[in-house]
């Protein structure tokens, strides 16, 4: 358990994961299994074995496992048996065991696996027989036919063992003892669930006489031509070798290793993430044929530019963990393919394999579908940060061999993939000589691909400058030529060196819960400063594990839900895709902001800007439509020329008839002209919109409050009042309106680990801001979640005027809400003035009014922004139109309930009952031209706040409508920058103007 080395025994040298016709036997399926509470043979493992069972007896062929359970391979044992085999545990930074490397706790769950496999007679003539494990967490010991074969380490790294001479024709026994904790656990602290077991495939391989041990076909591109450089590991009896690339007419025979030479290809289509052209190739020897797919591309750094095939790359990437709510990290190809197809549909062009090599088939898919890949080594020691990096293995000579072994296995397995454009040494492992040694090894082995590692702040051993969660001011200073501001952890000289390199954000716009906000600020910097090459969102998908309450209610579990003593809560729920595969509103925002084709719509035409790396717009058409008050009046397809990558054109519009009096919008969509491997024909890449005509006048009904008749009989239009308080709207019993300043805090509202911008300037602290409490903490301190009202005045002489003061116990700051009700024909008009008193010293989450409706209200139709939610710093995906949604689709079911569902700038809202229109609410602009937004939900903000999971929300007894004059922005402060000052909601007076009419 305490061995810091990479493993021992009959370990074979790492090599490529190849598609070959050599014989192989999969060992996936049911294995005999038992779970022990500790590791036999260790001081803490005394007594864990049955009486009279020897420590290593499990490996004996005569051992009786008939009473054991069955365990599927691949799988994690803690995800099987409904807790019978232990439970998952989640931590982000902290270790779930004492930090005393290389020691681990006595309580070390250990799984024993046994199965038999029948080996064909003809394998007796194989040159070698190999047992291959693609992934086992964390340390494991292997026996075959009673013979100890070796020890493996490196949970997400392939390991092969030579079992030649041990395996025999007929039935063979394979035994694996897997320990959850080992010294390796200290270097695998990767912000994910700790999930032990054999979770990737196991194979028995027959290596044929005259076979190909390894091959690396380096295929580069320049000036329209390609070049293939072959590196082949094979014995003399494997020759002659024949390389065939049918698509290029190549058939080359090498009679010996000495004859292997580069092949020049005079004309070839290059590979890129946008045009992933692959050429099928085979390399055949006397005993084996290996199949590969070649992608011709050249990666280089020229000054501070990162180039592929001579063109600057902008990474619109995501960090991708391997996670599934039922299988954990066990691979499923159909799910993985859909995962990557969804990425393409949402304009993701790059993947960082956080924080380990993925299943090798994922990289085949990345080659095929087209992604720039940062392939990361299986390495993270983040837990040492909590002890000031004392004892960090990254600078400990005792760990050097293990570090080098990990990077060798990473590079060697995946070196043939054209999608990989950067090797990453790992993540959040501090810095030290072992990391520098890893980098030196990579540079020697693969001089073309650059080396990445974010923790190398000073740039001593890496080729690109990388940061995570740098603020907008910091990022701007990194991109600015001649800036003298010191960079994080750098001297002036080191800062200058880092500014001479390409810069990328290996993690940014943290996507936890509702957010992230202000993605466009980063994208604007990438447009302005060529040194900035984009980044990778943290992260792609929530890691929720499917669980059920004792009553059988399904939910997605996060840290602490399995009784962990040490955990990091719902920090594992920080993806742009929810655990069930639902894209979040933040992902739609991202898609629009990073769109590879940008549309700027004007009254006289459309500017089509092709921001792609190399692909033209030949695969697109540009569909336009004109909508008056949200209803289509004309549509067509632009007569647009093909736009080359990096170019822009202005396309004139056909003559458009715009009638006065309504609100008329022109919308243009860039859509796929034909189906692809990842989307159907008509899929929308990006959208542009322009206001052609605004309403000519302020609605006449807004003047009704000036000449309201007396309130007689308790009625004004569709409103009915009781004792000076609203009781019914269009026959619907209601409660309200009341002032609402509270929203259920988002994960970003709760964030305090990064500086705050409410009390400090974002440019303070070298552009990183200054420490501050979370926004949610300040809101609670201000009592915004517990406001109570006191009616100050009720006047029914002209309509109904009602003034209420809202404030919290033990606090003097308040909010005055004046309601002025009047009648307009058969409709009711409401003007609400919201005026803060003195004494407020914080931003507000929202400023609006809440009206509780009957639970029979089940949806909404609206004219305004949509179809998804929007907030002040998350508006780019919103467009103006007419939309419809059922109640449950108006909010987002985040794993931890929080604010969601706000639709800004609503003009008209119709609430539905049993799917039919019931109450129409029109909104008018205030004196500053601002429209309110709305949220319609099943629960109050206070009820949502109190729930840790969706199933903890109380049974709904109402529909809760909040009309907001304003909302606070989202930011990404759960792990990143606070809400930018422009999008903060400071206490201020606002007016809301509404008209209510019976509908249907």
Language-model features: where?
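Substrate-binding/catalytic cleft of secreted carbohydrate-active enzymes
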Residues: 340-343, 350-576
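An acidic-aromatic loop/edge-strand motif
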Residues: 16, 79, 84-87, 92-103, ...
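Beta-strand-rich binding/interaction modules
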Residues: 142-144, 225-254, 261, 281, ...
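Accessory carbohydrate-binding/adhesion or oligomerization-edge regions at the termini
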Residues: 1-92, 177, 523, 530, ...
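Beta-strand/loop-rich accessory regions of lumenal/periplasmic or secreted enzymes
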Residues: 180, 272, 654-662, 674-676, ...
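Substrate-binding clefts and catalytic carboxylate motifs of secreted carbohydrate-active enzymes
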Residues: 23-28, 32-43, 72-73, 78-80, ...
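Accessory beta-strand-rich segments of carbohydrate-active enzymes
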Residues: 2-19, 32-38, 54, 68, ...
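Active-site-adjacent substrate/metal-binding segments within catalytic domains
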Residues: 75-119, 123-133, 137-143, 150, ...
């Amino acid at each position: 358990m305490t061995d810091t080395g990479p493993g021992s025994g009959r370990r074979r040298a790492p090599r490529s994961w190849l598609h070959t016709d050599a014989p192989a036997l999969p060992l996936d399926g049911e294995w005999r299994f038992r779970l022990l509470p500790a590791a036999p043979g260790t001081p803490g493992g005394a007594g864990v074995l049955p009486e009279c069972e020897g420590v290593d007896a499990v490996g004996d062929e005569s051992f009786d496992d008939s009473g054991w359970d069955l365990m599927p391979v691949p799988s994690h044992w803690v995800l099987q048996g409904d807790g019978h085999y232990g439970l998952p545990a989640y931590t982000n930074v902290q270790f779930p065991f004492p930090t005393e490397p290389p020691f681990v706790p006595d309580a070390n769950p250990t799984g024993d696996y046994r199965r038999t496999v029948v080996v064909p007679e003809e394998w007796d003539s194989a040159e070698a027989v190999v047992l291959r494990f693609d992934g086992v967490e964390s340390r494991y010991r292997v026996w075959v036919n009673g013979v100890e074969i070796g020890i493996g380490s490196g949970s997400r790294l392939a390991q092969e063992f030579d079992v030649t001479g041990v395996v025999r024709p007929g039935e063979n026994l394979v035994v694996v003892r897997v320990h959850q904790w080992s010294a390796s656990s200290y270097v695998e602290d990767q912000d994910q669930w700790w999930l032990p077991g054999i979770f990737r495939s196991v194979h028995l391989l027959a290596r044929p006489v005259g076979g190909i041990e390894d091959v690396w076909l380096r295929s580069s591109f320049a000036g329209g031509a390609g070049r293939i450089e072959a590196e082949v590991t094979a014995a003399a009896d494997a020759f002659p070798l024949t390389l065939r690339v049918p698509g290029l007419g190549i058939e080359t025979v090498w009679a010996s290793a000495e004859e292997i030479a580069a092949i020049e290809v005079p004309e070839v289509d290059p590979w890129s993430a946008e045009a992933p052209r692959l050429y099928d190739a085979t390399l055949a020897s006397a005993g084996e044929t290996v199949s590969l797919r070649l992608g011709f591309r050249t990666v280089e750094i020229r000054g501070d530019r990162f180039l592929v095939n001579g063109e600057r790359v902008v990474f619109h990437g995501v960090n991708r963990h391997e996670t599934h709510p039922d299988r954990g990290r066990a691979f499923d190809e159909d799910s993985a393919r859909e995962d990557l197809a969804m990425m393409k549909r949402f304009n993701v062009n790059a993947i960082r394999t956080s924080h380990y090599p993925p299943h090798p088939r994922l990289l085949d898919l990345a080659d095929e579908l087209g992604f720039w890949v940062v392939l990361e080594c299986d390495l993270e020691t983040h837990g040492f940060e909590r002890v000031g990096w004392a004892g960090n293995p990254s600078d400990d000579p005792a760990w050097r061999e293990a570090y080098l072994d990990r990077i060798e296995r990473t590079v060697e397995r995946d070196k043939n993939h054209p999608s990989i454009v950067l090797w990453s040494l790992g993540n959040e492992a501090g810095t030290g000589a072992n990391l520098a040694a890893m980098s030196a090894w990579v540079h020697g082995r693969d001089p073309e691909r650059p080396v990445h590692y974010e923790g190398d702040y000073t740039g001593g051993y890496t080729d690109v400058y990388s940061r995570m969660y740098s603020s907008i001011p910091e990022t701007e200073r990194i991109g600015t030529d001649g800036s003298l501001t010191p960079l994080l952890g750098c001297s002036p000289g080191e800062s200058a060196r880092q500014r001479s390199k390409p810069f990328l954000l290996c993690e940014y716009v943290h996507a936890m819960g509702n957010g992230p906000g202000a993605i466009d600020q980063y994208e604007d910097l990438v447009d302005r400063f060529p040194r900035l090459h984009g980044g990778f969102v943290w992260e792609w998908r929530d890691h929720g594990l499917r669980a059920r309450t004792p009553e059988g209610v399904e939910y997605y579990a996060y840290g602490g839900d399995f009784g962990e003593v040490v955990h990091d809560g719902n920090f594992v729920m920080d993806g742009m895709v929810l655990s069930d595969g639902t894209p979040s509103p933040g992902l739609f925002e991202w898609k629009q902001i990073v769109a590879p084709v940008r549309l700027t719509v004007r009254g006289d035409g459309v500017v089509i800007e092709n921001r792609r790396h190399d692909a033209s717009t030949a695969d697109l058409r540009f569909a336009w439509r004109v909508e008056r008050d949200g209803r289509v009046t004309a549509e067509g397809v632009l007569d647009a020329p093909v736009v080359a990558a990096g170019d822009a054109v202005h396309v004139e519009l056909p003559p458009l008839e715009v009638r006065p009096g309504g609100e008329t919008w022109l919308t243009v969509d860039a859509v796929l002209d034909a189906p692809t491997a990842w989307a159907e024909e008509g899929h929308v890449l990006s959208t542009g919109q322009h206001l052609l005509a605004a309403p000519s006048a302020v609605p006449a009904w807004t003047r009704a409050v000036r000449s309201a008749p007396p309130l007689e009989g308790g009625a004004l239009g569709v409103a009915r009042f009781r004792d000076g308080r609203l009781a019914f709207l269009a026959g619907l019993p209601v409660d309200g309106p009341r002032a609402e300043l509270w929203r259920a805090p988002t994960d970003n509202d709760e964030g305090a680990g990064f500086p705050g911008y409410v009390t400090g300037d974002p440019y303070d602290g070298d552009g990183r801001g200054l420490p501050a409490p979370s926004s949610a903490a300040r809101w609670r301190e201000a009592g915004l979640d517990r406001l109570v009202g006191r009616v100050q005045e009720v006047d029914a002489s002209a309509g109904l005027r009602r003034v209420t003061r809202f404030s919290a116990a033990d606090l003097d700051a308040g909010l005055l809400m004046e309601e002025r009700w009047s009648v307009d024909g058969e409709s009711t008009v409401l003007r609400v003035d919201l005026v803060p008193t003195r004494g407020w010293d914080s931003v507000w989450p929202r400023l609006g009014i809440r009206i509780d409706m009957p639970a029979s209200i089940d949806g909404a139709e609206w004219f305004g922004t949509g179809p998804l939610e929007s907030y002040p710093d998350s508006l780019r995906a919103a467009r103006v139109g007419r939309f419809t949604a059922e109640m449950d689709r108006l909010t987002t079911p985040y794993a931890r309930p929080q604010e969601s569902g706000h639709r800004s700038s609503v003009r008209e809202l119709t609430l539905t009952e049993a799917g039919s229109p019931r109450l129409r609410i029109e909104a008018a602009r205030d004196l500053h031209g601002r429209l309110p937004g709305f949220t319609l939900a099943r629960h109050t903000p206070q009820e949502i706040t109190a729930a840790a999971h969706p199933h903890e929300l109380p049974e709904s007894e109402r529909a809760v409508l909040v009309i907001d004059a304003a909302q606070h922005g989202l930011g990404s402060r759960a792990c990143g920058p606070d809400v930018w000052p422009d999008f903060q909601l400071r206490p201020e007076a606002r007016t809301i103007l509404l008209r209510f009419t019976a509908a249907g």
